[in-house]
């Protein structure tokens, strides 16, 4: 329980209507979840405006409301310029600034965030640390998994989660930090010790508008790093041009990694096979060979980023090497589906042009037969990448099958027609039903072919306008293989 005015001390400026200083027992952004003694934040969403539900929140027990405009209510109304940012600051104080007591590592970038955070988690667990993880796949406190709705949750959920981590004995936490979260201020109040940048390629332009704005949003993580007396570190990809801008934006120590350009963590003599990747790692004064189970040049970048983050967090390089060489993979990331079939099936989360191209190029270098790809694009998301995804699919695969991803409120065939605009040649099919598309790819496969099922990776659902169904690419692929080969 905290007094309202005490919580408001964390805000830079506000106006109070209906003065009062009630006890705050909980904080909410969903009026349906408000209980007696709650503080309700009016948040403007894409389709719903929380200001329209302020009275309902009061009826449910809210004793104060934070809004972006004056409201006629019977409880104190705190008017702020940006209620979402205010919520981040208030939530941080309400939950006792939990990240101040955690070693917090944030990872941002277009691709690779999930893999990098999981690699760091493995290294830290091997050091005997109790870890927490927040990202695309789930929230994890120790070994307990919880479902997440966003890559980076809303600040209210985020700070509550960090408080739960602290209470559970977590000492080190890894978090995927999305550009949406940075732009909207969700991670305000998070005290990052290390911030990692993976790469920057076109994505989310429906939200940010331009690549320059997208880059600026990513850079906010590094701009806010190093604002305290404690030593902070920015881990940047020396092979990505955006890193130069991020280095200028931060006052923290900068450590780099890369393959092509000179870096503090440098991979040399990279050798990729169908079972893994080996390379020589040169890091400061040390040099060693790593042999990892992960496949592809993009995997080397992920490993370098994780190694650098762990190293600046105090883990010796030899122990980092040992942990990384034990990693078998991350769910839905270049994950193979096996059932004694004479061809290879790979499920990958690749849902951006860059990630799809990386996966298909890697597969193309390994394939003895044809490369076939099943791919779609999400509905209600950046439409500009649809023809680009199709162009990449038809350029780097022998055959592409365009199908539904998560259509959401859009008509699936409208999305496929948008994709078709970028297709090269005629070596592609359009099959609206994703299960049917996967079965077709398996049916067409010949010995030594490689099939890539792209876009959904670890996801276990498919979202349509009026329903969400159970759907797992790995399970469907397994069913298709069994039907053909048993």
Curated annotation (Swiss-Prot):
Is Cell wall biogenesis/degradation included in the keywords of this UniProt record? yes
Where it mainly occurs, coarsely classed, is: cytoplasm
Report the protein name in the record. Answer: UDP-N-acetylmuramoyl-L-alanyl-D-glutamate--2,6-diaminopimelate ligase
- Entry-linked PANTHER family: MUR LIGASE FAMILY MEMBER (PTHR23135), UDP-N-ACETYLMURAMOYL-L-ALANYL-D-GLUTAMATE--2,6-DIAMINOPIMELATE LIGASE MURE HOMOLOG, CHLOROPLASTIC (PTHR23135:SF4)
A biological process (GO) of this protein is:
regulation of cell shape
Entry binding sites for meso-2,6-diaminopimelate: 381, 405-408, 455, 459
* TM region positions: none
Q: Which GO terms describe its molecular function?
A: ATP binding; magnesium ion binding; tetrahydrofolylpolyglutamate synthase activity; UDP-N-acetylmuramoylalanyl-D-glutamate-2,6-diaminopimelate ligase activity
Q: Which cofactor does it need?
A: Mg(2+)
Q: Source species, please?
A: Halalkalibacterium halodurans (strain ATCC BAA-125 / DSM 18197 / FERM 7344 / JCM 9153 / C-125) (Bacillus halodurans)
Among Gene3D superfamilies, the record links this protein to: Mur ligase, C-terminal domain (3.90.190.20), Mur-like, catalytic domain (3.40.1190.10), MurE/MurF, N-terminal domain (3.40.1390.10)
Q: Where does UDP-N-acetyl-alpha-D-muramoyl-L-alanyl-D-glutamate bind?
A: 31, 150-152, 178, 186
Q: Which InterPro entries match?
A: Folylpolyglutamate_synth_CS (IPR018109), Mur-like_cat_sf (IPR036565), Mur_ligase_C (IPR004101), Mur_ligase_C_dom_sf (IPR036615), Mur_ligase_cen (IPR013221), Mur_ligase_N (IPR000713), MurE/MurF_N (IPR035911), UDP-N-AcMur-Glu-dNH2Pim_ligase (IPR005761)
Recorded catalytic reaction(s): these are:
UDP-N-acetyl-alpha-D-muramoyl-L-alanyl-D-glutamate + meso-2,6-diaminopimelate + ATP = UDP-N-acetyl-alpha-D-muramoyl-L-alanyl-gamma-D-glutamyl-meso-2,6-diaminopimelate + ADP + phosphate + H(+)
Which E.C. number(s) belong to this protein?
A: 6.3.2.13
Q: Which family does it belong to?
A: Belongs to the MurCDEF family. MurE subfamily.
Its pathway is: Cell wall biogenesis; peptidoglycan biosynthesis
Q: Where in the cell is it found?
A: Cytoplasm
Residues bearing PTM N6-carboxylysine: 218
PTM entry text: Carboxylation is probably crucial for Mg(2+) binding and, consequently, for the gamma-phosphate positioning of ATP.
Give the GO cellular component terms, alphabetically.
Answer: cytoplasm
> Motif Meso-diaminopimelate recognition motif, which positions?
405-408
Role this protein plays: Catalyzes the addition of meso-diaminopimelic acid to the nucleotide precursor UDP-N-acetylmuramoyl-L-alanyl-D-glutamate (UMAG) in the biosynthesis of bacterial cell-wall peptidoglycan.
Give UniProt keywords alphabetically: ATP-binding, Cell cycle, Cell division, Cell shape, Cell wall biogenesis/degradation, Cytoplasm, Ligase, Magnesium, Nucleotide-binding, Peptidoglycan synthesis
């Amino acid at each position: 329980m905290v007094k309202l005015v005490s919580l408001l001390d964390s805000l830079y400026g506000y106006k109070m209507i209906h003065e009062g200083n009630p006890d705050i027992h909980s904080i909410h952004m969903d009026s349906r979840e408000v209980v007696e003694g709650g503080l309700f934040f009016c948040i403007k969403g894409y389709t719903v405006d929380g200001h329209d539900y302020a009275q309902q929140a009061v009826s449910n027990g809210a004793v104060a409301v934070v809004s972006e405009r004056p409201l006629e209510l019977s409880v104190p109304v705190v008017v702020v310029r940006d209620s979402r940012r205010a919520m981040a600051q208030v939530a941080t104080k309400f939950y006792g600034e939990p990240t101040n007591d955690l070693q917090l590592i944030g990872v941002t970038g277009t691709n690779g965030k999930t893999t990098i955070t999981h690699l760091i988690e493995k290294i830290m667990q091997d050091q005997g640390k109790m870890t927490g993880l927040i990202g695309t796949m789930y929230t994890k406190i120790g070994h307990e998994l919880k479902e997440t709705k966003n890559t980076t949750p809303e600040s209210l959920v985020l700070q509550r989660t960090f408080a739960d981590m602290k209470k559970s004995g977590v000492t080190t936490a890894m978090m995927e930090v999305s550009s949406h979260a940075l732009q909207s201020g969700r991670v305000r109040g998070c005290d990052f010790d290390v911030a990692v940048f993976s790469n920057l390629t076109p994505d989310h332009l429906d939200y940010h508008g331009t690549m320059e704005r997208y880059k600026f949003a990513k850079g906010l993580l590094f701009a806010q790093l190093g604002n305290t007396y404690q030593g902070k570190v920015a881990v940047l990809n020396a092979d990505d041009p955006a890193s130069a801008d991020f280095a200028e934006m931060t006052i923290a120590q900068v450590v780099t990694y890369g393959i092509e350009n000179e870096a503090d963590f440098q991979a040399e003599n990279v050798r990729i096979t169908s079972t893994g990747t080996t390379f020589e790692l040169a890091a400061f004064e040390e040099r060693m060979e790593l042999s990892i189970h992960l496949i592809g040049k993009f995997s080397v970048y992920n490993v370098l980023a994780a190694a650098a983050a762990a190293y600046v967090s105090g883990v010796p390089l030899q122990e980092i090497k040992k942990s990384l060489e034990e990693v078998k993979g991350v769910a839905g990331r270049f994950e193979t589906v096996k059932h004694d079939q004479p061809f290879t099936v790979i499920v990958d989360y690749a849902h951006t042009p860059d990630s799809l191209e990386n996966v298909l190029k890697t597969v193309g270098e390994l394939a003895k037969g044809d490369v076939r790809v099943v791919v779609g694009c999400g509905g209600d998301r950046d439409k500009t990448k649809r023809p680009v995804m199709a162009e990449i699919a038809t350029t780097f695969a022998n055959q592409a099958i365009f199908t539904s991803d998560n259509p959401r409120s859009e008509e699936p065939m409208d999305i496929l027609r948008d994709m078709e605009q970028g297709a090269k040649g005629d070596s592609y099919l359009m099959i609206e039903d994703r299960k049917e598309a996967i079965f077709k790819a398996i049916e067409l496969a010949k010995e030594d072919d490689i099939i890539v099922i792209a876009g959904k990776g670890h996801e276990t659902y498919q979202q349509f306008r009026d329903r969400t169904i159970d759907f797992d690419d790995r399970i469907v692929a397994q069913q298709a293989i069994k039907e053909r080969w048993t």
